[in-house]
Amino acid sequence: RSTSSAASDVYKRQDMYRNRLWTMRQYAGFSSVSESNQRYLSLLESGVSGLSVAFDLPTQMGYDSDDDMSSGEIGKSGVPISTPEDIESLFDKIDLEKVSLSMTINSTASILLAFYISLAKKRGYSLNKLRGTLQNDILKEYIARGTYIFPITPSLRLTTDIFEYCQENLPNWNSISVSGYHIREAGSTAIQELAFTFANAITYLESAKAAGIDIEKLTTQISFFFNSHRNFFEEVAKFRAAREIWAHIVRDRFKITNIKSQLCRFHVQTAGSTLTAQQIENNTARTTLQSLAAVLGGAQSIHTNGKDEALSLPSEENALSALRIQQVIAHESGIPEFIDPIGDSSLIEDMTNDITKKVTNKIDEIISKGGVEKLIQNGTCLLYTSPSPRDCRL
């Protein structure tokens, strides 16, 4: 590969999965805190190595469950959380120091993180032993989802305040997971997914730098969240390209030479928009290929969708079957024994180079137009205003 030695060092994963498998982190949350807690306990018993909490829309938008605005949405797309006591019940019988936790929350991220920290302190845990990730990616809410509360400037300030708190108090916590997943689900291409994700990340680093935060340290607490879509080889190449692009951004734009800061650590979820409501058994084949692409792309953690998610939240049986897909790849395929097994493929290398070039050009275009914050303010990059492919199909 024609890369500089610094970028090449972080592009490659020296051991890949030989010494440590990816985290099998199944996204879950529904109905009530007690039912969600039972699902988490079941998943942990079945072998997941990390939990990922889905919150319902009222929680995402800052409404209590008894608010009139919450009517019809309570527990529908995730677990409803209104009080610190709800968080306490949600993690009943779960050792917070032994489980890495991902919280998919953005507009109300500071509130939910405060609830979780309060619980940890109540149970006597040391904050520096807590491991987890807060999504905290407000920019993509304006671009792809629409679940924001405040105007963009104060919202970005809240996000930046969380960076500072986590840097000082939660050293093993990722203070943001910059998310391309939702951008892809809203109808973007693979190129746009990476370009807007990294343009958002640049905006966050610039905001943190302006606030006096140590961005070299911050880059070690940034993770990413990508989509694994239907084009198998494109997705593998996309994940590989992401590592190289991020390394160059950190090193060349922000002049950070620390190799750890240049690492692109990312979670992958299979593409919900590719699932069909008809012949749902075929969805298992789809998610298997998408999970395999994530593995060959070197993901740090993976969520595999249940085959019934085109119809509803996954049943416990289908959630378990989805987890088993990852476990079969991990323990029965032999793939983890090899480092970057398709890395020398001319197809993959050419696609990786092509994606890297196109994404870099797109990022430059976004920045030349004033950056993400300006494009959001003038309505240039709002994807959620258009129906996604899944919405059109339904």
Positions of predicted regions on the chain:
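Catalytic alpha/beta active-site cores
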Residues: R1, S5-H229, E234-E235, R253-I256, ...
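Single conserved hydrophobic/aromatic residue that forms the stacking wall/gate
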Residues: S2-A7, Y11, Y384-L394
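Short glycine/threonine-rich loop-to-helix capping motif typified by GTGT followed
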Residues: L112, G187-A195, H229-A241, T270-T284, ...
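Flexible glycine/proline-rich, aromatic-decorated loop/lid segments
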Residues: N258-Q269, Q278-N305, S315-I335
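Append "with occasional cross-activation on large, charged helical scaffolds in nucleic-acid assemblies
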Residues: L275-A277, Q300, E373, T380
